[in-house]
C-alpha cells in the first residue's frame, strides 16, 4: 500500500486563530497559558484533518509561533547576545518573539533579527545570526513536547526539522562576508552536528521511526565545499537510531543529485511539480532500500491536480519501487490557504477548479488509492470529478479575452525608451523643487480599526458609496495634513481605501477572483490573502486616479500616485498555470500602463510603482536568471511607457537582496528607487561599491516591522554610511517599507525623528 504523507500544514488556522491569539498575547489581552492552549488546539485540529485523509504520518515541527526557522534557531540556543539569553536557561517564548519583532510582553526591547524571503516564495523567515565559534545546545523543548502531544492523540508522527546545511546557509554574520555560501560557515558544523545527533536520539527515545530533515538548498547552485559538507554531515548523523527522509523542494536536484545519492539517508523527497523532468534520474540513482517520496501535488498553487497525468507518470515507478514509493505534496502546504470549504461566496464554477491545503490532502489520498489499484466506486467517482473540473476550466469562456490578446500582440511595438536620466531629473527638479535629502514615505499609513471598519461596512452594503467616499476623503486629508505638519517633502495619500497592495488592484482588474478566507502566512502574525488570476487581465476603469487627484488637490507639495507593479502582482497572486507566467505579467503591465497615463493626465507629478517582489521571482538556478530578468524588467518599463520626462517614476523594493542583479535594477530606469536596508545595516548597498547606480535612491533608514522608534543619530549614521558609496545629491530619506501595520503614536514619533535626521544631514552638507 502506497504511503502518503505531508511535508507541513498551514499553522495559522482556517480562521487565522493563531494570528489573533498571538496578537492578543502581545497586546496583553491574553495570558501565555491561553496562547499555549490555542496552539495545542490548532495542532490537534490539523493533525486530525491530516490523519482523517489517510496520511500514514502526521508532521510535527511544522507549527511555529512566528517562523519555523526561528523556532529551530531558538531550539539550538543560537540567540544573539543583545537578547541577554542566560546560557543555562531555556529560551523563553518571549525571547523568541523579541528576536522576531524586537519586543515582547517581557524582556527589554532590542533590534529584531533580519527577516528575508524564503527562497522564491512570499513567506519570510527570520535569519539566523552566526558568529565564529558559536556553540549550540537544546534550549527549547517545544518539538519534543509536540511529539508527545501527537502521540497521546494516537497519531504516528514524522518530526520535521531544518537541515544543518540549510540552516547554516540561510544564516548571516558580520564575520561571513562572502554571502550565503561563505565556506567559513561550515566550520560551525563541528559544534552544530552533535546537537542534531542529540535531537535525533531524543526523538528515537520517544518512539519516532522517521524524521524529515529539510534541505531545500539542494535545489540551488552549491559550491563544491558545500556539496562535500553534505557527505560529512550526514555521515555523522547516520549513526542516529531514526530513519531520515531528506526533503528537497522548490526545484530539481540537477547537479546536486550525485551528492544526494551518496548520502546515508533512508529516503529522499523530490519536487516533481517544479521539476518533473528529474523523476527518471532520481529513480535510477536510488539505492536498493531507499524510499522515494514523490512530490506530485502542487504545494504552492491552488489549482486542482491532473490526477490522470500523475498516475501515468507514477505507475511505472510504483511497479519498480513497490512500497518504497511514497506520495506527498511538492513542498509544505504552508504556502496555500487552509480549506476551500471556508469559501462560501466563490462562484461554483471557479470553486470547482481549486484545491486548498485540506483538499490537497484528499487529492493525495485519492491518488494513492488509485495508484494501489483501488477500483472502488468512491475512487472512480473522485477521479471522474477531477477530470470534469479540469475539462470545464479548459473550455470556460471566462479564461480568454480577445481584446487582451490583440493588445498583447501589439505590445512589442510600444517604445519603452525615455530621455536619459540626467535630462529627466533636471526637468523633474525644476517642476518639484525638492531640497537635498528629500523625505518621503513608502505609501501606506496606519490602518486603524476605524479604517478597516469603513471598508468592511462599505463592502457589506452598510455604508453607501457617497458616505464611504466622504469618510475616506476625510482620512486622506488627515494624512496629508499630518505629513505637512511633520515636514515631509513628497507626500502620499495613505491608502486608507486599500486592504492589501495586491488585492486592491486585483479587485479592480478583470481576470481576478477573490476569497474570503484564503489567508496564507507572510511573516510572524501577518497574513495575506492572495488574489487568484484565473484569466486574461484587463483594466475596465481607472483604479486610483480619483483618490490620488483628490489628495493632490489638498496641498502644494507633490503627492505620489501609488501602484503595485506587474511583477509583484504576479508574484503575490496565485497565478493561472495554463500559460507562461511571462504572458500573465505582460497583461498586468499593459493594464497598469493605462493607469499610469491616466494619473499623469490628472496632474499627478510623481508615480510610484512598487516592485518589492522583483528578486523573489528569480529562478533558484542562476542559469535561468537572465531569461526571467529580461521579461521582468521589460514588463516594468512597459508599465511606464509613454510618461513625460518631467513625471518622476519611483519604485520600491523591500527585503530584496539584489546585489547580484543590480544591472537589471538599473535597467528598470526608475527615477527613484527606495529599498529596505535598515535591518541589514545598509548591507544591500554593497552592490553600489562596484556599480555606479545612475539614478536617485532612498535607502530605508528605519525598520517599520519593529515598533521601536528609531534614534535620530542612528539614522544619520546610516545615511552617512550610504553616502560613502552613493552621491549625496542622489539620496532620499525614507522608511524601509509602508506604515500600514504600525500604530499612529510610533509612526508620528518615527517620522518626526526621520525628518530631523534629514535636516541634520542638510546642515552638515550645506
UniProtKB/Swiss-Prot annotation:
L-homocysteine binds at residues 442-444, 495, 610. Zn(2+) binds at residues 652, 654, 676, 737. Signal peptide: none annotated. It catalyses: 5-methyltetrahydropteroyltri-L-glutamate + L-homocysteine = tetrahydropteroyltri-L-glutamate + L-methionine. 5-methyltetrahydropteroyltri-L-glutamate binds at residues 16-19, 117, 526-527, 572, 616. L-methionine binds at residues 442-444, 495, 610. One of its GO terms (molecular function) is zinc ion binding. GO terms for biological process: methionine biosynthetic process; methylation. Pathway: Amino-acid biosynthesis; L-methionine biosynthesis via de novo pathway; L-methionine from L-homocysteine (MetE route): step 1/1. Its cofactor is Zn(2+). The keyword Nucleus does not apply. It comes from the Bacteria. Keywords: Amino-acid biosynthesis, Metal-binding, Methionine biosynthesis, Methyltransferase, Repeat, Transferase, Zinc. The active site is at 705 (proton donor). It is an enzyme of class 2 (transferase). PANTHER family: 5-METHYLTETRAHYDROPTEROYLTRIGLUTAMATE--HOMOCYSTEINE METHYLTRANSFERASE (PTHR30519). Belongs to the vitamin-B12 independent methionine synthase family. HAMAP family: Meth_synth (MF_00172). Catalyzes the transfer of a methyl group from 5-methyltetrahydrofolate to homocysteine resulting in methionine formation. This is 5-methyltetrahydropteroyltriglutamate--homocysteine methyltransferase. It comes from Bordetella avium (strain 197N).
Amino acid at each position: 500500500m502506497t504511503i502518503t504523507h505531508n511535508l507541513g500544514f498551514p499553522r495559522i488556522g482556517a480562521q487565522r486563530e493563531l494570528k489573533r491569539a498571538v496578537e492578543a498575547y502581545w497586546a496583553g489581552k491574553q495570558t501565555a497559558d491561553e496562547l499555549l492552549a490555542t496552539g495545542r488546539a490548532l495542532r490537534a485540529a490539523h493533525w486530525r484533518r491530516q490523519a482523517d485523509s489517510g496520511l500514514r504520518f502526521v508532521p510535527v515541527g511544522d507549527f511555529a509561533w512566528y517562523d519555523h526557522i526561528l523556532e529551530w534557531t531558538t531550539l539550538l540556543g543560537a540567540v544573539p547576545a543583545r537578547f541577554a539569553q542566560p546560557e543555562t536557561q531555556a529560551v523563553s517564548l518571549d525571547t523568541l518573539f523579541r528576536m522576531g519583532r524586537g519586543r515582547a510582553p517581557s524582556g527589554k526591547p532590542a533590534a529584531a533579527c533580519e527577516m528575508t524571503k524564503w527562497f522564491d516564495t512570499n513567506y519570510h523567515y527570520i535569519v539566523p545570526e552566526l558568529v565564529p565559534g558559536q556553540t549550540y545546545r537544546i534550549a527549547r523543548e517545544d518539538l519534543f513536547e509536540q511529539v508527545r502531544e501527537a502521540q497521546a492523540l494516537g497519531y504516528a508522527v514524522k518530526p520535521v526539522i531544518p537541515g544543518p546545511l540549510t540552516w547554516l546557509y540561510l544564516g548571516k554574520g558580520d564575520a561571513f562576508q562572502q554571502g550565503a555560501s561563505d565556506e567559513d560557515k561550515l566550520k560551525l558544523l563541528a559544534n552544530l552536528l552533535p546537537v542534531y545527533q542529540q535531537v535525533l536520539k531524543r526523538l528515537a527515545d520517544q518512539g519516532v521511526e522517521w524524521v524529515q530533515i529539510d534541505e531545500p538548498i539542494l535545489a540551488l547552485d552549491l559550491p563544491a565545499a558545500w556539496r562535500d559538507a553534505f557527505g560529512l554531515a550526514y555521515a555523522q548523523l547516520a549513526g542516529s537510531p531514526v530513519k531520515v527522509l531528506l526533503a528537497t523542494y522548490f526545484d530539481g536536484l540537477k547537479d546536486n543529485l550525485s551528492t544526494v545519492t551518496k548520502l546515508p539517508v533512508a529516503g529522499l523527497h523530490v519536487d516533481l511539480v517544479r521539476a518533473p523532468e528529474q523523476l527518471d534520474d532520481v529513480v535510477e540513482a536510488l539505492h536498493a532500500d531507499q524510499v522515494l517520496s514523490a512530490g506530485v501535488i502542487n504545494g504552492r498553487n491552488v489549482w486542482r491536480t491532473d490526477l490522470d497525468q500523475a498516475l501515468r507518470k507514477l505507475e511505472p515507478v510504483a511497479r519498480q519501487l513497490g512500497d518504497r514509493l511514497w506520495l506527498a505534496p511538492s513542498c509544505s502546504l504552508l504556502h496555500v490557504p487552509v480549506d476551500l470549504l471556508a469559501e462560501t461566496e466563490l462562484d461554483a464554477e471557479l470553486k470547482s477548479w481549486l484545491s486548498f491545503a485540506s483538499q490537497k490532502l484528499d487529492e493525495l489520498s485519492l491518488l494513492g488509492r488509485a495508484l494501489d489499484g483501488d477500483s472502488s466506486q468512491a475512487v472512480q467517482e473522485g477521479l471522474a470529478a477531477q477530470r470534469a473540473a479540469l475539462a470545464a476550466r479548459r473550455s470556460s469562456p471566462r479564461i480568454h479575452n480577445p481584446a487582451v490578446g490583440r493588445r498583447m500582440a501589439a505590445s512589442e511595438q510600444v517604445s519603452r525608451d525615455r530621455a536619459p536620466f540626467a535630462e529627466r531629473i533636471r526637468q523633474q527638479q525644476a517642476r518639484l523643487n525638492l531640497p537635498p535629502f528629500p523625505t518621503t514615505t513608502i505609501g501606506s499609513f496606519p490602518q486603524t480599526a476605524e479604517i478597516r471598519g469603513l471598508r468592511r461596512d462599505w463592502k457589506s452594503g452598510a455604508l453607501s458609496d457617497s458616505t464611504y467616499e466622504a469618510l475616506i476623503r476625510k482620512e486622506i486629508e488627515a494624512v496629508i495634513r499630518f505629513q505637512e505638519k511633520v515636514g515631509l517633502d513628497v507626500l502620499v495619500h495613505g491608502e486608507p481605501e486599500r486592504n492589501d497592495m495586491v488585492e486592491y488592484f486585483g479587485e479592480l482588474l478583470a481576470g481576478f477572483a477573490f476569497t474570503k478566507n484564503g489567508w496564507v502566512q507572510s511573516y510572524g502574525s501577518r497574513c495575506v490573502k492572495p488574489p487568484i488570476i484565473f484569466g486574461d487581465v484587463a483594466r475596465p476603469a481607472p483604479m486610483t486616479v480619483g483618490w490620488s487627484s483628490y489628495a493632490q488637490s489638498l496641498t502644494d507639495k507633490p503627492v505620489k500616485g501609488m501602484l503595485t507593479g506587474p511583477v509583484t502582482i504576479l508574484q503575490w497572486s496565485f497565478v493561472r498555470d495554463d500559460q507562461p507566467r511571462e504572458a500573465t505579467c505582460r497583461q498586468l503591465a499593459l493594464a497598469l500602463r493605462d493607469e499610469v497615463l491616466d494619473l499623469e493626465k490628472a496632474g499627478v507629478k510623481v508615480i510610484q510603482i512598487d516592485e518589492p517582489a522583483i528578486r523573489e521571482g528569480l529562478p533558484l538556478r542562476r542559469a535561468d536568471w537572465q531569461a526571467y530578468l529580461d521579461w521582468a524588467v521589460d514588463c516594468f518599463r512597459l508599465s511606464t511607457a509613454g510618461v513625460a520626462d518631467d513625471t518622476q517614476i519611483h519604485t520600491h523594493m523591500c527585503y530584496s537582496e539584489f546585489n547580484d542583479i543590480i544591472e537589471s535594477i538599473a535597467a528598470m530606469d526608475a527615477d527613484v528607487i527606495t529599498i529596505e536596508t535598515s535591518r541589514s545595516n545598509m548591507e544591500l548597498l554593497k552592490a553600489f561599491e562596484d556599480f555606479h547606480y545612475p539614478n536617485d535612491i532612498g535607502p530605508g533608514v528605519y525598520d517599520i516591522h519593529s515598533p521601536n522608534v528609531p534614534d535620530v543619530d542612528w539614522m544619520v549614521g546610516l545615511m552617512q554610511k550610504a553616502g560613502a558609496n552613493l552621491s549625496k545629491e542622489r539620496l532620499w530619506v525614507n522608511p524601509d517599507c509602508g506604515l500600514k501595520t504600525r500604530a499612529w503614536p510610533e509612526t508620528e514619533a518615527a517620522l518626526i525623528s526621520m525628518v530631523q535626521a534629514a535636516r541634520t544631514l542638510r546642515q552638515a552638507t550645506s
